[in-house]
Amino acid sequence: MFINNNLFYFFIILTFLGIKSDISKSKTKKKPNVLILFSDQHNKKTMGFENHPDVITPNLDKLSNESVVFDRAYATRGICVPSRMSLMTGLYPRTMGLMDNNEETSVTDRATSLASVFKYNGYKTYAFGKRHLKGGGDKGWDIKKEVHPEEGDNGNYLSWIIAHGYEAEFSYDWAAEFGKGPKGSKEANAKIPTANLGTRISKLPFGYSMEAYTALETIKMIDQQKNSDKPFFCFSSFYRPHQPYNPVKKFMDMYNVSEWGKGTKLNSAIKMPASFYQPTKDLPPLLQFQRNGGNKVWNMDKAFKDEQLWRNFIGAYYALVTEIDHYVGDILQALDKANIKEETIIIYTSDHGDFAGNHGMVEKAAAGHNVYEDILNIPLMIRIPGKTVQGKHTAELVTLADIIPTLIETLNLKTPKLENNFEGVSLANLVLKDKPLNRDYIVSESWFQSTVISKSAKLGIMKQNLVNSSQDYREFGDMFFDRINDPLEINNGINDQKNQQTIAQLRVFYEEFIKQVPGIGITEIVNKK
């Protein structure tokens, strides 16, 4: 009996230890990794799954089938830095005082970045490729490698390409827009010919572009992290399809630009964008200026006399999107090979779009009017292994400022002390439980134009430019687009009587927005003037 009692207690102890071990394991279970795949200036419609007649993106198509896809995701401002900072800080440009690329305020200096939040929660943090961030938005990285040399970085593309013997080739590519080599290169002060519409075929061989470098560093990180007991947050940020438009030959050869055709997917030449011939007089002032050759970098007036230049640019843009897709595929394959794809949340998005020939325009027309869908509507897909409904599309209105609160709620992250509370909203219930967000509107704004976007309409409000009086376009008037009946945004219906009730409601929405987001950063910038 004594022996039996001892055995009984022995088994009780073993069972207790087993339970305790399981509890301990559950407490220390590693959180999911987070990988943001980011591109610069990616027009949302230029992907295969968007039924584009030309653009080839098999890897993004596959990712979309595994993700929740946001059809109505928008940039908070249609240029790089303000939009990227909204992603990284959860703040709107007016709060940061960051309406252009070069502004800095006490808000940007003290902002808490997404990387800092992850680091605070025990993540290893990485950034590869173009960051283009300010102040606190660029803090919190354990390892960071940019395109150009940056103080405090762990490496950069320029040093890498020089080490491989292709400095002159990269400088030639860079000069297509800037007329000289990149800062830090031997050709930084050289005079190298620019290219019409910033477009020419790269002299670099396949595998040596900025995109290749970003992918290579990301894949190396994945291999290093696969057995780590620490989760990772990685911001893999491709420079392209931003100008200069220099695809390598491998991808350019996929598009026939010799004439206008029915589309690459019909084994024809590229198809002319539907709004390509929109009359100049119907465009807002800054775009009229560009169209008439006001910016000699783009030579749009020359291009309309020789449409081959337009086809070269549009084909090059498509080729750059396909190149990004190729490297996205390599990164996703590396996750599979490391057997950690199902442990990794994957987000694909961009900071803003590119006209890509629509409205007869190139790039974002040098930070032109902050209103068109081509510039503001961005790709966004979120894949959470085992939780997201695969291939689901949602038409809910969202912005990049929503990403940081979404990840915090989804992963139950703790936040360090915040100087300013996040202004975006969490999409967790929408992504994980398919609960509607029921947002009536969102706002994207520059110094001279604020755009209110509802589910069916858009109002671009011209306003007093508080920092640059030469860019004050109130005389031109506001712009209204019926997104249901005019998806190409060709007809400005601001004076149409049938639109007045909708326009009035959009103005009410904007007044509501500026009360909720008063613009402490804007006030700081204006007071400095």
Each PLM stretch: what is its role?
Residues 57-58, 87, 130, 136-140, ...:
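Polar, surface-exposed loop/tail segments
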Residues 27-68, 119, 249, 491-499:
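Active-site-proximal N-terminal segment of extracellular/periplasmic enzymes that hydrolyze or transfer
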Residues 30, 53-57, 74-79, 104-112, ...:
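A short beta-strand-to-alpha-helix junction
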Residues 173, 372-376, 444-495, 527:
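C-terminal, low-complexity/hydrophilic appendages and adjacent surface loops
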Residues 51-84, 90-91, 95-96, 119-126, ...:
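Short, structured active-site-proximal loop/turn typified by the sulfatase FGly-forming signature C/S-X-P-X-R
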Residues 89-205:
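Catalytic-site neighborhoods of secreted/periplasmic enzymes
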Residues 29-34, 135-157, 171-173, 210-273, ...:
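Active-site regions of oxyanion-processing enzymes, predominantly non-cytosolic
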Residues 55, 247, 333-388, 399:
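Histidine-centered active-site microenvironments of extracellular/periplasmic hydrolases
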